[in-house]
Swiss-Prot record:
Residue sites binding ATP per the record: 10-11, 18, 89-91, 99, 124-130
Subcellular location(s) per record: Cytoplasm
Transmembrane intervals: none
Named cofactor requirement(s): Mg(2+)
Top-rank taxon: Bacteria
Species this protein is from: Shewanella pealeana (strain ATCC 700345 / ANG-SQ1)
GO terms of biological process kind: coenzyme A biosynthetic process
A GO CC term assigned to this protein in UniProt: cytoplasm
InterPro entries in the record: Cyt_trans-like, PPAT, Rossmann-like_a/b/a_fold
Protein name: Phosphopantetheine adenylyltransferase
Length: 159
């Protein structure tokens, strides 16, 4: 069965937790589209173009992964990409309530779009983009939480 999946997010920045889920999704689905949301309401540290480039670097070794920036409704983006599955990560129980509401809203807007939830590897379960940015902002070493190119980009942004 040919399944195209979308792993959506802001990815500001992409972390090792995200990379772990991307690799596992790439093993589960024939084609995975990393949908990077423009999401100006979040005031991202990195521009959409920068986030796309960082994700392309992190996923360069995965032949069935494509990185695309988008704006607008996720369900519309999924339809444009001919995707039938949304991949979402759940780090903790606290993520579940929001993700459950989001999955139900997406199902209401697009009944054929299925949500699949993956949990991160234990060593990545506490990592969030927000925490990584906070550590980097205060001069901390984030290289154990993100790809080296992402760590370098964060260091440049912090200066």
């Amino acid at each position: 069965m040919h399944k195209r999946a979308i792993y959506p997010g802001t990815f500001d920045p992409v972390t090792n937790g995200h990379a772990d889920l991307i690799e596992r999704a790439a093993n589960l689905f024939e084609h995975v589209i990393i949908g990077i949301a423009a999401n100006p309401s979040k005031q991202p540290r990195f521009t959409l173009a920068e986030r796309v480039e960082l994700l392309k670097t992190v996923t360069a070794h995965l032949d069935n992964v494509e990185v695309v920036g988008f704006s607008g409704l996720l369900v519309d983006f999924a339809k444009d990409q001919n995707a039938s599955v949304l991949v979402r990560g759940l780090r903790a129980v606290s993520d579940f309530e929001y993700e459950f509401q989001l999955a139900n809203m997406n199902r209401r807007l697009s009944p054929d779009l299925e949500s699949v939830f993956l949990t991160p590897a234990e060593e990545n379960s506490f990592i969030s983009s927000t925490l990584v940015k906070e550590v980097a902002l205060h001069g901390g070493d984030v290289s154990q939480f993100v790809h080296i190119e992402v760590a370098n980009a964060l260091t440049k942004k912090a200066k």
